[in-house]
Amino acid sequence: MPGMKSPKGARAAIEKPANGKETTKKLIKHYLIDYKWQLLIMLIFAVGSTVFTIVGPKILGNATTEIFNGIVGKISGGTGIDFSKVLGILLTLLGLYAISTFFGYIQGFTMTSVAQKLTYRLRNDVAVKINKLPMSFFDKKTHGEILSIVTNDIDMLSQNLNQSITQIITSVCTIIGILIMMLTISVTMTLVSLIIVPLSFFIIRIVVKKSQKYFKKQQDYLAYVNGLVEEDYSGHDVIRVFNRENKTIEEFNRFNKELYKSAWKSQFLSGLMFPIMNFFGNVGYVGVAILGGYLASQGIITVGNIQSFIQYNKQFVQPINQISQISATLQSMLAAAERIFGFLEEDDEARDVENFVSTDGLVGNVEFNHVHFGYTDDKIIINDFNAKVKDGQKIAIVGPTGAGKTTMVKLLMRFYDVNSGAIMIDGHNVKDFKRGELRRMFGMVLQDTWLFGGSIKDNIKYGKPDATDEEVIEAAKAAHADHFIRTLPNGYDMLIDEEAGNISQGQKQLLTIARVILTNPRILILDEATSSIDTRTEQQIQSAMDNLMKGRTSFIIAHRLSTIKNADLILVMNQGDIIEQGTHEELLEKDGFYANLYNSQFQEGEE
């Protein structure tokens, strides 16, 4: 449809796995096999519960026959109804139903336990896997896709597994059991009942096939409407600024009308299934009643057996319906399991070397030696990068967006490995260190601040959980954060909400800087560290950073070139290559790429 936005998170009404057979094998082999004894207990009690329930109508039919014979006998001058015998039958029936209920409870308890244990294991496996995946994986996947696996897919697998396995067992047992009971009562009446079943399912299949496309449209348009609501809510200020309220309402109404049409048709067709089943059920009921009456008049069958057969006949269709519904549920469950296993089978980050180099005693000399790198093999973005950095130097990396500045820092910390060449720290290839120890050498302040829900103190201590309160306060003072923290309610113990919306963007940046200061790293990385802070705060930060960077190798990535004038070396990057290098004054004298960048920013500042 022209102009239609792509659905956010829309999925078909019934999902199908690409390879359901293989996914089922993995689910059994890697997870369900560990619960084989619980599943066996569940199977035994599920079958037992179903069997006791199935026998009920037959026993109730015996009571009906006894009452009928008693009434007929009374009329003909006999003894009448034997109530003690009827009571015995009813007590037996009550006992069977009580046992069936108990068995059902054990079966439900056991299956729920298995499903929740499976959910627990899967969540743990996914959580562990996330920390093993290379950064390249997260470049290919959105946060929403990963969150959907952790939440929606695992929940769907757990819930559907709990319901589906139980329903499959009970439905199959019920169908077989009822069929056996019907055959023991009357083969002729059973054949009459079975003739109606395929006819009813043929009609229902046509209705389901017709309604399915409308369910698909309903899901799609629901996703469009939800997406519009989300966009309109998050961007309502912009909508009002540009006077787009009417246009937004028109667009919403268009999709909402389509949702109404598809939802109405799908629900209407879906609602036809019960009347159709009811109609054919009544037809079967009439046929069985007429035939049963005839057979009873001939003395071939008892009245109680007719009553039992009618009850079995009405119960027979229900488990068949359940199995048809379960098949769709199983498809969705296996599709969810397939996505989970696909995630768990992703390649892990390359393992650390066994004979790793210790970081003890390293001072921070860094060398980039003919480094080539691309996020994909066919698109190299860093070409033959060479640079030598002495310990304690302040190195600024500048260049236009997409020049490869941030990528160089990611390579330095081994978020990615180079395609060719080497990155050395004090003469050792970064691949020769354990990743954990290598990254502990660095302190990083990112452009996008990240704080978790918790106290300000805990956020500052994130990189050094055993830090004392005095150390936390000293770090906050060095980052010029102590003053504003003390003005907040509860000071260092104030809780930051989930989105850190109760403090300003500049305050967030100050806290992340304090967090880095507390870890006392050997190598410092500032990625746009002051880009979102006001001028006064930036001056305070710059002063604190200058003190922090003394004696430490420091890499600064910034678009605002005024913040890196005092750098020992400025590397100017463009399209993955270093095209200029030198101090601020030397690069201005060259009147090259850097000078043009600096002058353009200076002119913008003047304007």
Question: Model-found features: residue ranges?
Answer:
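Transmembrane helices of ABC transporter permease
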Residues: 34, 38-51, 62, 93-96, ...
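Alpha-helical segments in transporter systems
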Residues: 29, 37-62, 93, 108-112, ...
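Cytosolic ends of transmembrane helices, especially the final helix of ABC transmembrane type-1 domains
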Residues: 221, 244, 268, 285, ...
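An intracellular "coupling" helix at the cytosolic face of ABC transporter transmembrane type-1 domains
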Residues: 29, 33-36, 135-136, 154-161, ...
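Short intracellular "coupling" helices and adjacent cytoplasmic loop segments at the cytosolic face
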Residues: 4, 9-16, 116, 124-148, ...
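Membrane-integrated ABC transporters
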Residues: 1-53, 68-89, 107-111, 115, ...
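ABC-type nucleotide-binding domain
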Residues: 79, 352-353, 359-607
